[in-house]
Amino acid sequence: MGSSSLVISPRKLRSDVYSYSYENDSNTPLVISVLASLIERTMTRNERIAKNCTWPLSNKTRVFDCHEIPDMTIQSYLERIFRYTRAGPSVYVVAYVYIDRFCQANPGFRINSRNVHRLLITTIMVASKYVEDMNYRNSYFARVGGLGTMELNNLELDFLFLMGFKLHVNVSVFESYCCHLEREVSIGGGYHIEKTLRCAEEIKSRRCGERRFNQIARIMM
């Protein structure tokens, strides 16, 4: 899915959320890029603060920490989830609501590079179950997210208990989070989103080049 021709505007974001069509739209929905930009900036801020101070960490929320940090940008990871699960744009808005509720319910939790991927696949899967009529099994989401099925099952259960099973999102809450994402685009957010997209594309190109180089190297050996 090409992202280089993606139109970045509040109107485009709103249009994607309410009328995105897999058949007619070749680009990734804008909400994914906006969410990736927001999360990456949050991670950068959290990791900068972490260097200067320490905050109490709950052992309960450490279940989202991975042993090794995945070598994949947030943008690329969200695009992968979108490509293989076909979860609609509204799912990502609801996932954003859930992440916010989770952080409010667990003040000691901070999104960082070690926990963000597991948190995202879990929240998107839970949001998909809430929003969509038809869903893939947990085992499929686990493969897409790079986890074991039992691992994702446990993360889902932990997530639900840690946020107090507060899954209901009414229309006014949904609209307020859509408006927040729109403001992210209109108030200088476009630059950050374009930067996020460029970084993701550069990493993809570099990896493709490395794969081609390795294939050539194997042939020459």
Model-identified regions with their sequence ranges:
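Acidic, Ser/Thr/Pro-rich regulatory low-complexity segments at or just upstream of the first helical elements
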Residues: 1-90, 101-108, 172-221
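Non-catalytic, well-ordered alpha-helical scaffold segments
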Residues: 29-33, 89, 93-96, 117-121, ...
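Contiguous, well-ordered alpha-helical segments that form the cores/surfaces of helical PPI scaffolds
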Residues: 79-80, 93-101, 117-129
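Beta-strand elements of modular eukaryotic interaction domains
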Residues: 83, 110-114, 150
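Short helix-interrupting loop/turn segments at helix-coil junctions
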Residues: 88-92, 127-135, 169
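Short conserved catalytic/interaction loops centered on acidic-Pro-aromatic/His motifs
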Residues: 109-114, 130-145
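Hydrophobic alpha-helical segments of small multi-pass membrane proteins
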Residues: 115-127, 145-151, 158
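Channel- or pocket-lining gating/hinge segments that regulate access to a cavity or pore
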Residues: 139-182, 187-188
